[in-house]
């Protein structure tokens, strides 16, 4: 096991591993135990009691956080004609079709989100093997396959985040930066929490949310008391 740094050891001393904190306390403590020298990301991690192998328990979607994430997302849009013009007007960083396919096949990945109009999915499908593993493949469930490219681009730029349960039932979502006011982080937390509660599959049995923790990029995890909200 790797030896923890002195900074991490000091950070861990501030956290009671046997305690579950209120959302407000967890956010404040996550910021206080941040050991990174940069403006680290604050993240919420969920452990859900679901079986992702079942189609109706594959929790996935997107939500616009009221206070954004603190990160400027670079958006690539696959569209033609008027839709391409709409995407550019909405603030898309890159817009194209076959030319973008060639760039990506050549190893170009200077973007964070990919949006496509439905008619372009046959073209984008050629990139499934490279975009899929990176979580960049457009999907109707996250609003990234749409004719309303203006809305899609504007939402991403406004702080839209995607979430998807992994094979172990975990979901990780950024809720802002250490530099954010605590109130803004709490508001973002409440937004994603409400969305995930509403996404509970009707077939899920037992306690739906098994655990919630808040952490920073290199900080310790702080357990959240679900009875506090």
Curated annotation (Swiss-Prot):
Biological process terms in GO annotation: regulation of translation; translation
InterPro entries for this protein: Ribosom_uL1_bac-type, Ribosomal_uL1, Ribosomal_uL1-like, Ribosomal_uL1/biogenesis, Ribosomal_uL1_3-a/b-sand, Ribosomal_uL1_CS
Gene3D superfamilies: 3.30.190.20, 3.40.50.790
CDD domains: Ribosomal_L1 (cd00403)
Gene Ontology cellular-component annotations: large ribosomal subunit
Any one GO molecular-function label of the UniProt entry: tRNA binding
Keywords: Repressor, Ribonucleoprotein, Ribosomal protein, RNA-binding, rRNA-binding, Translation regulation, tRNA-binding
PROSITE patterns xrefs: RIBOSOMAL_L1 (PS01199)
Pfam families assigned: Ribosomal_L1
Family of this protein: Belongs to the universal ribosomal protein uL1 family.
PANTHER family (alphabetical): 54S RIBOSOMAL PROTEIN L1, MITOCHONDRIAL, LARGE RIBOSOMAL SUBUNIT PROTEIN UL1M
NCBIfam families: rplA_bact
Task performed by this protein: Binds directly to 23S rRNA. The L1 stalk is quite mobile in the ribosome, and is involved in E site tRNA release. Protein L1 is also a translational repressor protein, it controls the translation of the L11 operon by binding to its mRNA.
Subunit structure and binding partners: Part of the 50S ribosomal subunit.
Protein name from the UniProt record: Large ribosomal subunit protein uL1
Organism this protein belongs to: Enterococcus faecalis (strain ATCC 700802 / V583)
């Amino acid at each position: 096991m790797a030896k923890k740094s002195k900074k991490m050891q000091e950070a861990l001393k501030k956290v009671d591993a046997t305690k579950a904190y209120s959302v407000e306390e967890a956010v404040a403590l996550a910021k206080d135990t941040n050991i990174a020298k940069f403006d680290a990301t604050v993240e919420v991690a969920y452990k859900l009691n679901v079986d992702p192998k079942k189609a109706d328990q594959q929790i996935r979607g997107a939500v616009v956080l009221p206070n954004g994430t603190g990160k400027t997302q670079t958006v690539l849009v696959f569209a033609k004609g008027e839709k391409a013009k709409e995407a550019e007007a909405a603030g898309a960083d890159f817009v194209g079709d076959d030319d973008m396919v060639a760039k990506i096949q050549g190893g170009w990945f200077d973007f964070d989100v990919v949006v496509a109009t439905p008619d372009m999915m046959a073209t984008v499908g050629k990139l499934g093997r490279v975009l899929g593993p990176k979580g960049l493949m457009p999907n109707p469930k996250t609003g990234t396959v749409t004719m309303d490219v203006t809305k899609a681009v504007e939402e991403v730029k406004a702080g839209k985040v995607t979430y998807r349960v992994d094979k172990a039932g975990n979901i990780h979502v950024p809720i802002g930066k250490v530099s954010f006011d605590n109130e803004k982080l709490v508001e973002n937390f409440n937004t994603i929490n409400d969305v995930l509660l509403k996404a509970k599959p009707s077939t899920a049995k037992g306690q739906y949310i098994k655990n919630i923790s808040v952490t920073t990029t290199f900080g310790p995890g702080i357990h959240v008391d679900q009875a506090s909200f």
